[in-house]
Regions:
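Conserved helicase motor
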Residues: 267, 288-297
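ATP-dependent helicase/translocase motor core
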Residues: 1-264, 268-284, 301-303
Length: 304
């Protein structure tokens, strides 16, 4: 059953995420009268302009009791990541860490007010880890949705010169300053499913595929060599990979004016892809129902 608290956390989290990635306008007089000034809470374009802080055992006062997450990741004072670390010698350490994260959010279906929801208004990633293992998810995830991150992109495993544990791969692949901010800005979507909003974070293969596609579009200068194939297994997130690619292209000064055309070979997939795009991003979506429609849309100057 969906609880009111869960709705409040998710709606607030989505609002804050939108504020972070789309910036805000503040009325201010800089000598030429009061005007709306764009304020970047986070500078996504130049990561070094931000302040990054990792705090161990940070105590937070909750309504009924304090909580002390093992690690909180702050960017410009905002708690954007929470990591729970468990001993590998306890029973089911990964599940125990996830259960602890659920407790912090008051998501254990307990009548006790045992956590502090306000911490997760800002949260973008949650990690449970023990020894060399680690899994990541978002605030809407259940245990089965916590997944490993197996790629240190833009580095390859051979580039790093040593065999890395899954925990080290996740840290290298997700928590470099550039990748952390890139994931927050371009690889998170909020999608309605079965009457509730689900927050989704890209998987490592989607992140890599989008970056390689962007690199080819920008750096290959022979048009016929810009194409390629991204291979997915069934159920591995093809639609969301396309959404993430479209979002990242729209944020890139060199690619934002491109017109994107998505072709499908099945009516069901066509409907699914249209719904996914409509539900997860704010760009104009035109659904061509015939060849004539498609030709007319292509003739338009807009980058829809």
């Amino acid at each position: 059953m969906l609880r009111i608290k869960d709705i409040i956390i998710m709606e607030t989290n989505q609002y804050i995420w939108n504020t972070l990635v789309n910036y805000i306008s503040v009325e201010q007089d800089l000598g030429k009268g009061r005007r709306g000034q764009t304020v970047k809470i986070i500078d996504f374009d130049v990561p070094e302009n931000n302040e990054f802080l990792c705090v161990n055992q940070y105590k937070i006062e909750g309504p009924e009791q304090n909580i002390i997450p093992d690690i909180i990741l702050f960017v410009n004072g905002l708690p954007l990541g929470v990591i729970e670390c468990k001993s590998p010698y306890i029973t089911n350490p990964m599940e125990s860490g996830i259960d602890q994260l659920m407790r912090y959010m008051n998501r254990r279906n307990s009548s006790d007010n045992e956590g502090c929801e306000k911490l997760f208004f800002y949260n973008q990633m949650m990690v449970s880890t023990h020894f060399g293992h680690a899994r990541v998810a978002t605030i809407s995830a259940n245990v089965e949705h916590y997944l490993e991150w197996k790629d240190p992109y833009p580095f390859s495993i051979s580039d790093l010169g040593e065999e890395l544990s899954n925990q080290e791969l996740l840290i290298q692949g997700m928590f470099s300053k550039e990748n952390f901010l890139d994931l927050i800005r371009n690889f998170i979507v909020f999608e309605p499913e079965e009457g509730r909003i689900i927050k989704k974070l890209a998987r490592y293969q989607q992140f890599r595929a989008v970056h390689k596609s962007i690199d080819r579009l920008k750096n290959v200068h022979i048009p016929r060599e810009r194409g390629g194939i991204v291979w997915h297994t069934q159920g591995s997130g093809k639609s969301l990979t396309m959404v993430f690619l479209a979002v990242k292209m729209r944020k890139d000064p060199d690619l934002k004016e491109y017109k994107l055309i998505f072709l499908t070979d099945r009516t069901q997939l066509d409907q699914q892809l249209s719904a996914t795009f409509s539900n997860t991003q704010s760009q104009t979506i035109e659904h061509a129902r015939s060849v004539k429609d498609l030709i007319n849309y292509i003739k338009k100057d807009s980058s829809d």
